[in-house]
């Protein structure tokens, strides 16, 4: 389904410093 996708997006946002 899309659990890993959500984690990937969260990781990207964290790397960008948005979260």
From Swiss-Prot:
The keyword Mitochondrion does not apply. It is an enzyme of class 4 (lyase). It catalyses: (1S,2R)-1-C-(indol-3-yl)glycerol 3-phosphate + L-serine = D-glyceraldehyde 3-phosphate + L-tryptophan + H2O. Disulfide bonds: none annotated. Pathway: Amino-acid biosynthesis; L-tryptophan biosynthesis; L-tryptophan from chorismate: step 5/5. Its EC number is 4.2.1.20. Keywords: Amino-acid biosynthesis, Aromatic amino acid biosynthesis, Lyase, Pyridoxal phosphate, Tryptophan biosynthesis. Its cofactor is pyridoxal 5'-phosphate. One of its GO terms (molecular function) is tryptophan synthase activity. Tetramer of two alpha and two beta chains. The beta subunit is responsible for the synthesis of L-tryptophan from indole and L-serine. Belongs to the TrpB family. This is Tryptophan synthase beta chain.
């Amino acid at each position: 389904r899309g659990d890993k996708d959500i984690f990937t997006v969260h990781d990207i946002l964290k790397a960008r410093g948005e979260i």
